[in-house]
Regions:
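Amphipathic alpha-helical interface elements
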Residues: 1-224
Length: 224
């Protein structure tokens, strides 16, 4: 799912920039537990210590560009290290950021004033969006059907927007969430592919348009 991979790389870049600006570029600083917050989870994989240990392990990888930076400069900056981790790891890492750094990431991803959101609502929107996108990315990576997916992660609609019905559900909700981002390419990629496939299918099976619109929770307008 190219759009989700595109979003993943963008989020990694933004997170790395925020870390570098706020904490520093040396791993001894930006992988120091005191610079983050930890809320204990039942699953240890979602705890701060596990995430930091994972990132520390990546520093030992004997492959470029990590090896190059470690050898040439004696240090691996966050924008190099974070490129090597899974989307799930970077999302969990961002969830451990202190409020100021998490807000800085959210401000880079959203124009929250135009959405009439507070920065705290924007932080919630960011985390919910990332976890929902991860569900779609993982499903696609394992060959699952994403168009009819009901993600395990949920959007806190009432807390964020004051409306429990905003954004719809399913694939329509995914498009809604991607459409709120400043970085438009993932949304445009998904929308373009969907329009192309729907046009092809509905030209061949026009009676399917109503069913597909309901299943995907989107409005369908196709060219014959």
């Amino acid at each position: 799912m190219a759009a989700m991979q595109d979003l993943e790389e963008h989020v990694k870049e933004v997170a790395a920039d925020v870390i570098a600006a706020s904490i520093g570029t040396d791993p001894s600083a930006y992988l120091n537990m005191k610079n983050y917050r930890d809320r204990k989870k039942a699953d240890p994989k979602f705890n701060l210590a596990y995430v930091l240990n994972t990132l520390q392990g990546k520093l030992k990888v004997k492959k470029d560009p990590i090896l190059h930076y470690a050898t040439a400069y004696g240090s691996v900056p966050p924008w190099i290290l974070l490129k090597s981790v899974y989307f799930s790891t970077i999302i969990t890492f961002i969830s451990k950021f202190k409020p100021a750094e998490q807000a800085a990431v959210a401000e880079r991803l959203y124009d929250y004033n135009s959405h009439n959101l507070t920065i705290d609502q924007c932080r919630m929107l960011m985390m919910d969006t990332l976890y929902i996108c991860l569900d779609y990315r993982n499903t696609a990576a394992h060959g699952g059907r994403i168009y009819l997916l009901s993600p395990k992660s949920t959007l806190r609609k009432q807390e964020i927007f004051g409306n429990p019905h905003v954004g719809g559900t399913g694939y329509g909700q995914l498009l809604f969430l991607l459409g709120l981002l400043k970085y438009r390419r993932p949304y445009e990629q998904l929308r373009s592919i969907l329009n192309k496939e729907l046009t092809r299918h509905c030209n061949e099976y026009p009676n399917d348009s109503t069913y597909l619109a309901q299943a995907l929770n989107i409005y369908i307008e196709y060219k014959k």
